Amino acid sequence: MPATIKDIAKKVGVNPSTVSRVINGTASISEETRQKIKDAMKELDYHPNSLARSLVNGSTFTIGLVIDAGNSDAFSNAFFIRSVSAIEAVTQQRGFNLLITSDSDKEDNSAVKNLILEKKIDGIILPVSAATEELIDLLLGNHFPFIVLGEPDKVRDGIHWIDMDNKQGAEDAVNYLHRMGYEKTILLVENRITMFERKRIQGFQAAVGLNGKDVAENLIVECGVESNQIGEAIQRALNKYPDIDSIICTNNVVAYETLKFLKKKNIAIPGSIGIITFDNYPLAEYMDPPLTVVDIDTYKLGEEAANTLFSIIQNLGQHRKEVLLSTRIIERESTMKGEKRKK
């Protein structure tokens, strides 16, 4: 015979109403008691009736996460997977389910719209690439809880968003290289379209200026993502500035191709040119040489996004939240040229 709420309450030594409140998330219960109840539920193989919970609470106990269908690498991207893992962990801790959908029909976002209009979810997390004007209007017009993963191009009342502090990350990279004694740095960017790339450009420009260097536009090199494009872009920069001694790459693909190109040209790393890249992707520490990185904690990004969404669900009228999470430099051999020349 299946276990009941009374069985759970008896095992833990609390009232059935306390068990019910933990299951439904309707009251503040101490973490110790909450954990005991969850452990008992697991031990007795108790599964709450989701339909009954929904009827009692007026909640679906489900959070939506939209995936950028236009990004073919989304599910193979380690950073994306870590963010999703964090979001899922938070939703489970809250007793919710996570529903993942895509914006494959970008013309009208019909799948996402249906989730919102038919109240199939209690809140939604959107990547900035999916946060179209039309979809934002729909969410705001229906007073629907949502948060955008990434800084949007336009700031509007009611839009909550969370992102890494890409501008500060780029500033930190330039300042780190300056402390290490590097004098001439270029920034390799895949494009100037996305907000995070533009923020990294802004940070680079700000830090180069503060360090008393000439902030020439051609120190910012747009390189694309293909191997031959990146190699050609680096060669053009070296032809123009033979004294380049360091490169900041704005993502790991660019960094990998930069390593390949410099090795092919027999340019010593870090002996002649130091390299630092955004994103501490899994293989960065195993490259030859291991790459110094601007670490982007995407697990924390997903965790904060989910927790902020639950906060919004509980208090829909709260002031707009704009959250920037800090990056950090992880130093490895790609920027350590002999002895550290400056402390």
Question: Over which residues does each language-model region extend?
Answer:
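N-terminal helix-turn-helix DNA-binding module of bacterial transcription factors
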Residues: 1-61, 336, 340-342
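Short, well-structured alpha-helical segments in soluble
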Residues: 108-120, 230-243
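Amphipathic helical "hinge" segments at domain boundaries
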Residues: 46-110
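Flexible loop/hinge segments that line or gate small-molecule binding clefts
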Residues: 127-168, 253, 279-291
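Hinge/beta->alpha junction and helix N-cap segments in small-molecule ligand-binding domains
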Residues: 69-81, 100-107, 162-172, 188-233, ...
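Short acidic capping loops at alpha-helix termini that bridge into adjacent secondary structure
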Residues: 184, 215-219, 269-275
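Flexible loop/turn connectors
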Residues: 235-343
